[in-house]
Amino acid sequence: GKRHVVWNLDRQVNILSGINGVGKSTILNKVVKGLSAGGEFPSHMLKGVRLKVVPEDARWIRYDVIRSFDRPLVNPVSADKLNTSLADLATELDIQLFFLQRKYLDYQVNIGNRIIQCLQEATPDAAQKAQTISAPKKRFQDLIDDLFADTGKTIIRTENEIRFSQIGETLTPYQLSSGEKQMLVILLTVLVEDQRPYVLFMDEPEVSLHVDWQQRLIDLILELNPNVQIILTTHSPAVIMNGWADRVTEVSDITDNQ
């Protein structure tokens, strides 16, 4: 591009703010494009983007990208490929949810194996350790139940896949509202990171979220994964920053127009 951008990032929370059309998403996309799908970056200078990381000699980084626009699918994915009913998957958020369900099943197998291993060691604190291992999943379920309480939806805890109960009826995630899907995508993405160091990129996550959900978003993410580094763009920082005002950066502050 024509502008030189230098953005010094905080280890935990980074909020890039600016009006529409100022280049927030472009900056975020440039960084993401500098990383391969597996998080590798053989050089710290890629496609006009120089990345400085800690530790300095790192050659790959764990990351997730969440985009908030729930557009209809232009090219519906074939049902055979996904082994599910095409009628269920109508939007981009539905596709994200579908793949997150697979990751969620893997995550549960993983923590189940760790709990079994822990109990087999038969140490005096084995039960306590097992509880600690399963705590993030329970916290995730509690958080979703709390967020969805106004509409009477609760997660069915006996199911391996995510299903909801609402006044005696069972719902799939694809039957949720756009805002509910968006929040589920964000928190599920963070849960399956399994509390490991990750970079979480989010492009205007507030778009379809209730105002009170926007205000809680950053704290909820950090509660599920204290080791995550959040890098997000927003055009309404006053809403989303709730206690994080010092982590807000205006695009104009980091852009050299010369």
Report the location of each language-model feature.
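Switch/communication elements of ASCE P-loop NTPase nucleotide-binding domains
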Residues: 1-38, 157-258
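Phosphate-coordinating catalytic segments in nucleotide- and nucleic-acid-processing enzymes
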Residues: 1, 6-8, 29-175
